[in-house]
Curated annotation (Swiss-Prot):
PANTHER family: HPR KINASE_PHOSPHORYLASE, PROTEIN YJDM-RELATED
GO biological process, one term: regulation of carbohydrate metabolic process
Record-given protein name: HPr kinase/phosphorylase
Domains: entry comment: The Walker A ATP-binding motif also binds Pi and PPi.
Protein family membership: Belongs to the HPrK/P family.
Additional remarks: Both phosphorylation and phosphorolysis are carried out by the same active site and suggest a common mechanism for both reactions.
Annotated segments matching region Important for the catalytic mechanism of both phosphorylation and dephosphorylation: 219-228
Annotated GO MF terms: ATP binding; magnesium ion binding; phosphorelay sensor kinase activity; protein serine/threonine kinase activity; protein serine/threonine/tyrosine kinase activity
EC class of the enzyme, as a word: transferase
Annotated binding of ATP, by residue: G170, K171, S172, G173, L174, G175, K176, S177
Subunit comment: Homohexamer.
Length: 333
């Protein structure tokens, strides 16, 4: 199966969205507003952050002003310890003339009220956090990495089977949702059905799957209708997100197609440029796809943690028997 490799990436987010969302998702950060400005007017265009040491000192030739500006102990103490108030105001005025998204003061640091007023006049939001610069940078970078990551929505079902993220794909009507439902009934977890949103952060080779926020954890079963999986099976049956580790493609049985029987020739596919193992499963009456998906997950775990592949073990055993019999035959002659 060929997947669309062209992901979608956000060009920017508003500072208002940044503040509201990160406040909900990252409780440790606990950002607080220092001034009141229209946060909708400011936008963040980059996932990287900036410590503006040289820019505060007046060197702005290479100033990456489109990034969120982090004021740690060094920056705040530099400004607070300038004896000449006029010089301090001049340097900060030179700083805020750029269209900066926002300023974040870490470690509960404070700026003189005159500098906060300058930022307010320039319509630059200023926030404060009790977190250290290291912790704040880690949390904010992780959040922005997620916001500016490449993503794409695919048709299929995403399930967590024995801790392995399995993406079920295939043409409509093959029973992907029914297989996912059966897996949930057997104690596994549903991540998404019908519309699976897959993200790739930066240059990472990890793909994270989530549900479509509109469809949520609703599932359509042909002949039955829409089922609320969370309401029916409880919180244990759903997962907020899961790494995509194996792709299982359900296919119509075709007598002219040669399907893999031994597993020596491992297939793979690519999603957003990341290579993933692919298992193609032909659909036949009486075939228990649910149990096969469980075995697919167990085989993945065996290979990852024990480097054990059943087909290779069987091939090695047969080769040893053949070589042994050949040696005995040559000895008899």
């Amino acid at each position: 199966m060929i997947f669309d490799q062209k992901g979608i990436r956000k060009r920017s987010i508003t500072v208002a969205y940044f503040y509201n969302t990160i406040s909900q998702k990252c409780c440790d950060l606990k950002l607080r507003r220092v001034n009141n400005v229209d946060e909708q007017k400011r936008r963040i265009y980059e996932r990287d952050l900036h410590r503006p040491g040289l820019a505060l000192a007046g060197f702005t030739n290479l100033f990456t002003y489109k990034r969120v500006q982090i004021f740690g102990n060094t920056e705040t103490r530099f400004l607070n310890h300038l004896d000449d108030e006029k010089e301090r105001n001049r340097l900060f005025e030179n700083f805020v003339r750029f269209k900066i998204p926002c300023i974040i003061l870490t470690s509960n640091n404070k700026l003189p009220e005159s500098l906060i007023e300058m930022a307010t006049r320039a319509e630059i939001p200023v926030y404060s956090t009790r977190c250290s610069s290291t912790k704040a940078i880690y949390n904010i970078t992780d959040f922005l990495d997620d916001q500016f990551s490449i993503y794409q929505q695919y048709h299929g079902s995403m399930v967590d089977v024995y801790g392995v993220g399995v993406l079920l794909v295939g043409k409509s009507g093959l029973g992907k949702s029914e297989v996912a439902l059966d897996l949930i009934e057997r104690g596994h977890g549903l991540v998404a059905d019908d519309a699976v949103v897959i993200r790739r952060k930066g240059e990472s080779t990890t793909l994270m799957a989530r549900r479509n926020n509109i469809i949520d954890h609703f599932m359509e079963i042909r002949g039955l209708g829409v089922v609320d999986m969370k309401a029916n099976f409880g919180i244990r049956a759903i997962r907020e997100q899961k790494e995509v580790q194996v792709v299982a493609e359900l296919m119509h049985w075709d007598s002219d197609t040669e399907y893999e029987r031994l597993g020596l020739d491992a297939k793979s596919t690519k999603i957003l440029g990341v290579e993933l193992p692919l298992v193609q499963l032909p659909i036949l009456p009486g075939k228990n796809i649910t149990v096969i998906i469980e075995v697919v997950a167990l085989n993945f775990l065996l290979k990852r943690y024990s480097n054990y592949v059943a087909a290779e073990a069987l091939h090695s055993r047969i080769s040893q028997v053949i070589n042994s019999e050949r040696t005995n035959f040559d000895g008899d002659e």
